[in-house]
Regions:
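Outer membrane beta-barrel
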Residues: 1-88, 95-102, 106-113, 197-213, ...
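Active-site rim elements
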Residues: 91-93, 137-138
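Detector for outer-membrane/organellar transmembrane beta-barrel domains
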Residues: 114-220
């Protein structure tokens, strides 16, 4: 049995400025669209390929994150955090100091009564001081690792009620740069991954969708 989440989070009536929130503990942190959601809530049976390669399905580290919702007419949020670095995408922090850090920004809002959107950009960086093994091989990477993510989601509800009918278009793009060594062989390279999916909800009980994901990786020693 593994504990996935155990955290504390400030509420709007906490003695913080309006729009400011703090979250600390172990959680699925802000990174792209899917990471904050549990897998049982996903539209498909498994996570897209970049999530499985870069995040081992999800970034679930220990740390603290602060977010600020800007006082605008549309949804706008910025934030960042410090983390132990014991989970993917870093996986290999020494545990004595923050081994990973993040910053992010996202915007969104209603286009009209039936349509809405959200866009986001995210950065996670850290040092694999303890070494990180790949999900499907025994190569160990030590060095600096940075992950960049952008995401978007568009929703259209023909009736104005997303519980009845909804068409969604969603995608995320990943780029990971590694500068260090693989089993003492010097390596500096960037890999890429992305996915695109569309799901149509016919009614409250039935929906269907399509998804495509792809990876582009450099040669690894």
């Amino acid at each position: 049995v593994e504990l996935e989440e155990a955290y504390i989070q400030t509420t709007p009536d906490f003695n913080f400025p309006d729009g400011l929130s703090l979250k600390a503990g172990k959680a699925f942190w802000t990174l792209g669209y899917l990471n904050e959601h549990h897998v049982h809530a996903d539209d498909f049976a498994n996570r897209p390929l970049p999530y499985r390669v870069y995040l081992n399905k999800g970034w679930n580290d220990e740390g603290a994150e602060i977010t600020y919702t800007l006082p605008t007419d549309y949804y706008a949020e910025i934030g960042g955090g410090f983390f132990r670095g014991d989970d993917y995408p870093i996986k290999g922090g020494d545990g004595d100091s923050p081994g990973a850090y993040s910053v992010f920004a996202r915007i969104g809002g209603d286009i009209d009564q039936n349509q809405n959107y959200r866009l986001g950009a995210y950065y996670v960086g850290g040092d694999n001081a303890g070494g990180r093994k790949g999900n499907d091989d025994d190569n160990t990477f030590k060095g600096d690792s940075t992950l960049y993510v952008t995401d978007f989601r568009y929703s259209y509800a023909p009736t104005g009620n997303v519980r009845e009918q909804e068409l969604t278009l969603q995608g995320e793009f990943f780029a990971r740069n590694e500068d260090g060594t693989y089993d003492d062989v010097v390596f500096n390279g960037t890999s890429y991954g992305w996915y695109m999916q569309s799901v149509y909800k016919f009614n409250s009980r039935w929906r269907g969708g399509l998804r495509y994901s792809q990876m582009e990786t450099p040669g690894v020693p």
